[in-house]
Structures are given as C-alpha cells and as structure tokens.
C-alpha cells in the first residue's frame, strides 16, 4: 500500500540511511533503532554478521560474565560499576559514543579509566584526551595514580603548556580544562585521540557556545560524556 511505502521512505529519510557504490543501504550504527521500525513495516532485511551480533547484544544487553576487568586497574568494583564498565566496553567495541550519567560519587571516573586501560591492554597505546573543569584536573591526576598507575599522564596547564603539545602522542591520558580547550583548539584538533572524555559535560550543553564548538573540532575514535547529578542530566 502507498501508506506503507510512505512510512518506509520516511523512516529511511529520518535515520540518515544512504546507498553506497555497491547499491547497498547503509545504516549508521548509532541509528540501529531503525531496525525494529523497519521490521514492524515488514521490510525484509539482510544484515551483516557483525551487525546482527551487535543488534542482538544491544537489544538484550547484559554484562558478559567473561568480561574481565583490565589487569592495570587497582580497584574493587561494585556490581553497578562492573555493569557500567561492561556497557562502556560494549560501546567501545562497536565504535559508539555515549553518555555515562550517574549521581556524583558513584565512580564514573573509575569506570572511564577502566575502559581506557582495557583499550590499551587490548589494542595497544593511544592517547585519550580528558576535558574537565579546572577544579577537577587534580582529581583526575589523583584517580589515575591511585587506580590506573600504569597509564602515563600529561597535564596541559599553565603558560608553558604549549611546549608539551608535541608530546601528546606519547601519553595514554592527556588532561586539560574547558577553559584551555577553547584557547588551544587549533593545536589539539591536529591530533587523533582514541577517546575524548568530557567530565561534567553540562559545560557544553549550549551547543552554540565557544566551548562546545571547540570540542566538536576534536578528532577521536570514541567520545564519552560524563554527567553527575539528575538536574545536570536533563
């Protein structure tokens, strides 16, 4: 029926589906929710084996009992932290970006460090950029020293920070502030990061702000936003 065709075309248009050179329709991973909508419209789908596995795992997500915490993390994880880490690792494996939103004091930094450490152990070293409020920079340094001491850390702060830009590829974690990322974006955007982690990410909730615009210019395989209180998560 014409109505069904209209519904299918509307779904394709709204979910950024496009056709490649092999005449196949391509769906971005983060638009995977389209699958259910198309199935409800009785569209016959042929999915790649990798995407089929991803879709099944995402639809019935639970932290695998086989998933081990990284060896370099020195901490006892509570059950909810293990689940959070499992979700972050799932997103990492499938190239997804995400938000870890939880009340303050429940270990978001630890969970983020765990996935950074796990990625290093599984895939080798690559720099992660952590952007946080100036008042939290020391906390990140302290947490890394305590929970992930094998991660090498570079803090970009002070008037002499620019001389260290060339060292960025040699470190596991690079820490800077929202205030400085605005000033240094022309240099920072030259580097390819494994992760860009935004702590207290409400700092970029205004998409038109200079800070948000600067962050959008950063190159990273994965982006993770951390947010702390219910009012900030809205």
Region locations from a protein language model:
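Charged, low-complexity intrinsically disordered regions
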Residues: 1-57, 125
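ASCE P-loop NTPase motor core, strongest for the SF2 helicase catalytic module
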Residues: 44-234
């Amino acid at each position: 029926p014409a109505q069904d065709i209209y519904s299918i075309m509307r779904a394709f248009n709204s979910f950024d589906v496009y056709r490649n050179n092999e005449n196949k329709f391509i769906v971005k991973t983060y638009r995977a929710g389209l699958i259910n909508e198309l199935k409800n419209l009785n569209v016959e789908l042929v999915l790649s084996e990798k995407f089929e596995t991803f879709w099944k795992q995402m639809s019935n997500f639970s932290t695998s009992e086989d998933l081990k915490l990284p060896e370099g993390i020195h901490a006892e994880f509570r059950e909810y932290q293990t689940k959070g880490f499992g979700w972050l690792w799932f997103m990492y494996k499938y190239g997804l970006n995400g938000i870890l939103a939880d009340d303050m004091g429940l270990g978001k930094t630890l969970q983020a460090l765990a996935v950074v450490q796990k990625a290093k152990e599984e895939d080798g070293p690559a720099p992660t950029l952590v952007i946080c409020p100036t008042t939290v920079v020391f906390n990140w340094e302290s947490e890394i020293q305590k929970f992930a001491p094998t991660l090498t850390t570079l803090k970009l702060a002070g008037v002499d920070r620019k001389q260290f830009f060339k060292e960025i590829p040699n470190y596991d974690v690079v820490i800077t502030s929202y205030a400085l990322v605005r000033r240094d974006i022309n240099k920072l955007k030259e580097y390819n990061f494994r992760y860009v982690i935004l702590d207290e990410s409400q700092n970029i909730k205004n998409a038109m702000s200079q800070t948000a615009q600067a962050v959008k210019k950063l190159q990273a395989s994965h982006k993770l936003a951390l947010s702390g209180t219910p009012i900030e998560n809205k």
